Amino acid sequence: MSKFKVIEIKEDARPRDFEAFQLRLASPEKIKSWSYGEVKKPETINYRTLKPERDGLFCAKIFGPIRDYECLCGKYKKMRFKGVKCEKCGVEVANSKVRRSRMGHIELVTPVAHIWYVNSLPSRIGTLLGVKMKDLERVLYYEAYIVENPGDAFYDNESTKKVEYCDVLNEEQYQNLMQRYENSGFKARMGGEVVRDLLANLDLVALLNQLKEEMGATNSEAKKKTIIKRLKVVENFLNSNLNANTDSDEAVPNRPEWMMITNLPVLPPDLRPLVALDGGKFAVSDVNDLYRRVINRNTRLKKLMELDAPEIIIRNEKRMLQEAVDALFDNGRRANAVKGANKRPLKSLSEIIKGKQGRFRQNLLGKRVDFSGRSVIVVGPKLRMDQCGLPKKMALELFKPHLLAKLEEKGYATTVKQAKKMIENKTNEVWECLEEVVKGHPVMLNRAPTLHKLSIQAFHPVLVEGKAIQLHPLVCAAFNADFDGDQMAVHVPLSQEAIAECKVLMLSSMNILLPASGKSVTVPSQDMVLGIYYLSLEKAGAKGSHKICTGIDEVMMALESKCLDIHASIQTMVDGRKITTTAGRLIIKSILPDFVPENSWNKVLKKKDIAALVDYVYKQGGLEITASFLDRLKNLGFEYATKAGISISIADIIVPNDKQKAIDEAKKQVREIQNSYNLGLITSGERYNKIIDIWKSTNNVLSKEMMKLVEKDKEGFNSIYMMADSGARGSAAQISQLAAMRGLMTKPDGSIIETPIISNFREGLNVLEYFISTHGARKGLADTALKTANAGYLTRKLIDVAQNVKITIEDCGTHEGVEINEITADSSIIETLEERILGRVLAEDVIDPITNSVLFAEGTLMDEEKAKILGESGIKSVNIRTPITCKAKKGICAKCYGINLGEGKLVKPGEAVGIISAQSIGEPGTQLTLRTFHSGGTASTDLQDRQVSAQKEGFIRFYNLKTYKNKEGKNIVANRRNAAVLLVEPKIKTPFKGVINIENIHEDVIVSIKDKKQEVKYILRKYDLAKPNELAGVSGSIDGKLYLPYQSGMQVEENESIVEVIKEGWNVPNRIPFASEILVEDGEPVVQNIKAGEKGTLKFYILKGDGLDRVKNVKKGDIVKEKGFFVVIADENDREAKRHYIPRESKIEFNDSEKIDDANTIIASAPKKERKVIAEWDAYNNTIIAEIDGVVSFEDIEAGYSADEQIDEATGKRSLVINEYLPSGVRPTLVIAGKGDKAVRYHLEPKTVIFVHDGDKIAQADILAKTPKAAAKSKDITGGLPRVSELFEARKPKNAAVIAEIDGVVRFDKPLRSKERIIIQAEDGTSAEYLIDKSKHIQVRDGEFIHAGEKLTDGVVSSHDVLKILGEKALHYYLISEIQQVYRGQGVVISDKHIEVIVSQMLRQVKVVDSGHTKFIEGDLVSRRKFREENERIIRMGGEPAIAEPVLLGVTRAAIGSDSVISAASFQETTKVLTEASIAGKFDYLEDLKENVILGRMIPVGTGLYGEQNLKLKEQE
């Protein structure tokens, strides 16, 4: 750290620039040196003369003259007397601006404490003296005494309890001790003076050493905590001058007694103004009232002391003075706030700076600016993409100075006055000059709320009549603007640099891509989509069908002469090839750039296709081509939307004819279910689920019917259908509400009402139906309002935590990365690998799994083409560089960040990626749902919720899977975890019979087979093998990884598969629940119909060892009998285009070497099995089965107490159902006593139905009980926005799950104090012990093997646990997949890198575990950078470095913990931050954006990053 010089800020000369900012405590001398005189009187101004009173709060003598260069009495008036002091009124002649900077002071008769250092936790004064805050307050407010000198005083007569230094005594104790020990040196006082003396007498160095000794001596955690608290404060004081320059007087560290105020500084009067309103009233700043109270009380105290008043009166006056000063600094912090005349609390100095209306956020971070205006916006369809229409009236005002200059320059006016008059009269010359001024001078348009950088864009103004700003239709999406009365603000950039930036970076035609996802944002919407869609449709039998035309000109002529319909299918020549197309599509082709291929335009263009087209043009052609193409597209869209004349009529809404029939059928089914419920055949929950299922499916059937009808209507030219189909407006769901039925509605509590709305909007709703539907509609509106506030707050927190992240260097040189694969949730893919890898840099070579050659080298930037190749290559996971693993000292390097999505190129140094990330995550926040879902107990009817089936071909492998056979002979899953069913294909087969051996060497795994004569070895990459915790489904994905079915030392037969590629995997319990029925055997083949997928020649192969041997004698109709059969499709160059594995029992449909097309089915499966079901289970219940044979006994299960008896009327069977609400301490349990002393216990959840009786004999795999899923599921799932902020805030969830910290075997120990004890024993002998509350539902069994990171109990996984147990990379995966699930679920695309930037900021601090020789204290949270710098310093000096562990901070805590004082203070908890910083004398090196904005310096991003090198703008010759 270089030493800094303190800049003295003089009145007339402001410093040009400064490099750092330090916050310190001011000494009384310092305060006096600032002051220009003492304020003695509480008066402000004289009400008759309106002149300030002498020595009052507005005194001109102290603070300076009211008018420029004029003394108060008027003796000296003029610039020439500058610096003269008037003899009569004592005022120095100066600029009146000095009243904003000159301070005064009040000399207090007695020292008072500064409330920030008393009341802000931890109380600094209290901590230093070792006194509790409450006691300290009693001393300061004259209610108790504090011992200054204990002498030989004792509390009791036996002299055992000694009175200590700084003990606090009440009146009685004090009188008692004074009588007995006054002569032996005992002394105690009360009030501010004694506290100041005690602080002044502190020897901080001695105290520091004493505390460090105590720290070493003690073992109790609580004591350590209090000592550390004091240590921190003491160290802060001692270190508060570390960076000051040694030769200045600033070098003295802060002294504790400076926390007490003897001289109270008085704010300059213009910062607490007093303004005369008309009617003789005054608007006055509250601070003046607070100062007046202080002065009044201080003067009164002075008088009383001169009069030698009784002690009690003086004491009271001193207490009142302390209270007055407290109110001035922070009104209402202690006791009741002082209220003004209008009964509202007065605004103290603290309140002026904090909060949204405070100085920081109101005036420093956001200011009102000159040269701006606002108006309503209207659409400007004739504008170019980079233009906006600016009303002439507005332009006249905005560009007035430019215009005046132009008028003078052209000689129309000789003086400014004359020019102004011309402008007022609006003469012709004025308009001529205005046109010239505006030409080439861009303006910025902003639409509030400014959620991301595209909310402010620059345009070239076009002067228009009227008063509304005209906006180009394509930029509406970026601004989120519509024309229903939105307003926008216009700003004029003034400096040449600003104008250049607007033209080069901010012009709307430059901002075509969204920085959040890299998708184009300027995509035609609504009318434009409809026009282009209409143009691209084809109509059978239209006029002029099947004609042949030579080109676009002929087509246009034919259209104009009405002998050809625009939708007619015609043939024509395009690029020298004959193609079949329509006239409309040729018109579209005529506006496309030449490089667009036929398959992009010769089809029906819907919104998605148009978006893809725009993206393609941008990727191939760049900005300018795209911008002009978009304009042509817009014009075409509007023109044909008008010509098409599409409109809605009630006749377009077609109700299905058999609607009534379907409804009656559904009602009949509902009645049947109701009857079986009344008979007691099904439970109430099942009845509800089934009824809702019926209505759901009825609604779906009707919707499908209706869509078919609408689609057929007018040969696909039904207006409503076109709107929905093209993606212009509306959706199938909305049409079905118009034409089929409105469907099921929800109750206010989120559950579904079982009677649906049968009517549709065309028929109209009846009163009840209308009433049911209003709740949902109104809730939607209320939600939106709340959502905006929440989303805005989240954005603010994100901005604050990420504002200092910028790209600082090209490459940090790290080889570290994070392994990524596709993100899935319950078998649905949320984000594919291709999407995740796009725009990232590889951290490791990517190996092609088929050829084993390097596909992409480390350091490759993955663009769209490369990502596509990777997606098709079958690679399932890659290692990429991320901001989290970046090793740059400050910020992030370009390689770890990857592509700047806003422009599609590698990011450049100086880019403020933190802000971009925060905006990208915050901006779509308003589109997320607000609510926490109650899954109102509806069991969905999806197949995936009751079975899993194979989508690919291969054969089955069981991993650790055990099964029971039940009475019906079915196989039932016996594992609760750590098992899986895998679908694999062979990669290596044994060439001969032998013994297998597997060994790990560095990065490789060597598999060898050996018999008496020979041995073969196969080398695999360790990275490619599926890890046990991946197979068990704890982390990562296994698709495409390798699986070794045999262990070392096993005997294997010839032609056995020993290394296999996993194609699909279903783990227990996430994909296959416990007690499911398994429908496949180990090793069984799974056959599917296989399509070729590529054109070419078929060649058949068989696997031998690890290579393929050609098999030629394969004919159509053969059935495959051998493992390891492959078919390869070779292209015309005889290269492998595609390879398929053919399982046993497949039927071959083509001969060897036959030529085929990509759509041909080359392998057929057995006719009866289309999809191979692997396992299935009860969709509505979680089943509990017996794991051993034995006898059942009940615990805590009693009819009428913890359970209800239900009698099935039809069958007369009795069953017990556990009550929903149980008395505390009651845990219904089933116990099975087996052979010997073996017993298994099952805890039952509420609503469980029991199928056995006490004392029954049962067999393994019998069903004991079922818990309805709806009951298990109705726990709230936090979703949407609350889930996102929960993750970013890193909140510890209320019902956090207990998580295993090591791999090992679970053992249950004796319960301890009503808690269950679980011990996990690892293989290496280590163990971990957990105490678990009885109320939690334990999910593991005695003797099970469990992986680190798995849940032991139910509940939510806490991010902190993931970090602690599985490390930073696992946390990275967890947070990204959880957050992406929310956003993707709402259809919002955000690139991972934005989330990574925020996560890297949440991990920017570490917790010191062992401080070594550093200046840190155990338990300190310090930023990684400070930690690294300090350790490097200690190592250079040869000391012990500190050791730290990573911690995860929520975004709020991370933002407040920023290294920059100003940035933290302007975010939240302003007073606390400033209190801490002032004591430590903290430095702010002004490295980030926020503090520079506040101080008005250039921000260090973009060219500002190189501010020191002084860049000059050069004109191009």
UniProtKB/Swiss-Prot annotation:
Zn(2+) 2 binds at C812, C886, C893, C896. Binds 1 Mg(2+) ion per subunit. Binds 2 Zn(2+) ions per subunit. Keywords: DNA-directed RNA polymerase, Magnesium, Metal-binding, Nucleotidyltransferase, Transcription, Transferase, Zinc. It catalyses: RNA(n) + a ribonucleoside 5'-triphosphate = RNA(n+1) + diphosphate. Zn(2+) 1 binds at C71, C73, C86, C89. CDD domains: RNAP_beta'_C, RNAP_beta'_N. PANTHER family: DNA-DIRECTED RNA POLYMERASE, DNA-DIRECTED RNA POLYMERASE SUBUNIT BETA. The RNAP catalytic core consists of 2 alpha, 1 beta, 1 beta' and 1 omega subunit. When a sigma factor is associated with the core the holoenzyme is formed, which can initiate transcription. This is DNA-directed RNA polymerase subunit beta'. The lineage of its organism: Bacteria, Pseudomonadati, Campylobacterota, Epsilonproteobacteria, Campylobacterales.
